Amino acid sequence: MALSDADVQKQIKHMMAFIEQEANEKAEEIDAKAEEEFNIEKGRLVQQQRLKIMEYYEKKEKQVELQKKIQSSNMLNQARLKVLKVREDHVSSVLDDARKRLGEVTKNQSEYETVLTKLIVQGLFQIMEPKVILRCREVDVPLVRNVLPAAVEQYKAQINQNVELFIDEKDFLSADTCGGVELLALNGRIKVPNTLESRLDLISQQLVPEIRNALFGRNVNRKFTD
């Protein structure tokens, strides 16, 4: 039985409605899938950027902490250096004051002669030569001449060896020198300074740790007292 035009139109409309519905469902499915993929990608990108931001600020925070530690360490070191500078200046002041007082030793002739004798004998033990030239301040020549016999006897008594001492009356120690002697042997190739200043310098090197301890107390953090 042949379909009428109305039936044909009806079937066509039905087919078109079905196709349209299927197309709409497919479109909705595609949209839903696209939105899901978009949300997943968006979430991934957001998380990625969040991690980057967190990593950036963690790095910045560590840099700030490190900078704080460096600044704190620098400030602490500077403070320590300032304290050390003040202490060293004070120690130097004590030694400078001692140097200024050296000249007072020479004002007492008897005491100074005793000192000169000891300085000459000490120098002889260092130089250990049979012929020695003594150099002193011009003003001290008479005093040195007076103590030569006693110095020679003390030296001979210790090592049982004779020594000839000569006073250099051409070249003298500077008048600015506080006193003491300089010993020379072998045409000046051996020289032993034993002035009051040189003795103070030697003693001060040995006593600086003790001076520091006396002025500021012992540093419990140091194992050695150099």
Swiss-Prot record:
One of its GO terms (biological process) is liquid clearance, open tracheal system. Coiled coil: none annotated. SUPFAM superfamilies: V-type ATPase subunit E-like. Transmembrane segments: none annotated. Keywords: Hydrogen ion transport, Ion transport, Transport. GO terms for molecular function: proton-transporting ATPase activity, rotational mechanism. Pfam families: vATP-synt_E. GO terms for cellular component: plasma membrane; plasma membrane proton-transporting V-type ATPase complex; vacuolar proton-transporting V-type ATPase, V1 domain. It comes from the Eukaryota. Subunit of the V1 complex of vacuolar(H+)-ATPase (V-ATPase), a multisubunit enzyme composed of a peripheral complex (V1) that hydrolyzes ATP and a membrane integral complex (V0) that translocates protons. V-ATPase is responsible for acidifying and maintaining the pH of intracellular compartments and in some cell types, is targeted to the plasma membrane, where it is responsible for acidifying the extracellular environment. V-ATPase is a heteromultimeric enzyme made up of two complexes: the ATP-hydrolytic V1 complex and the proton translocation V0 complex. The V1 complex consists of three catalytic AB heterodimers that form a heterohexamer, three peripheral stalks each consisting of EG heterodimers, one central rotor including subunits D and F, and the regulatory subunits C and H. The proton translocation complex V0 consists of the proton transport subunit a, a ring of proteolipid subunits c9c'', rotary subunit d, subunits e and f, and the accessory subunits VhaAC45 and ATP6AP2. Belongs to the V-ATPase E subunit family. This is V-type proton ATPase subunit E. It comes from Drosophila melanogaster (Fruit fly). The gene is Vha26.
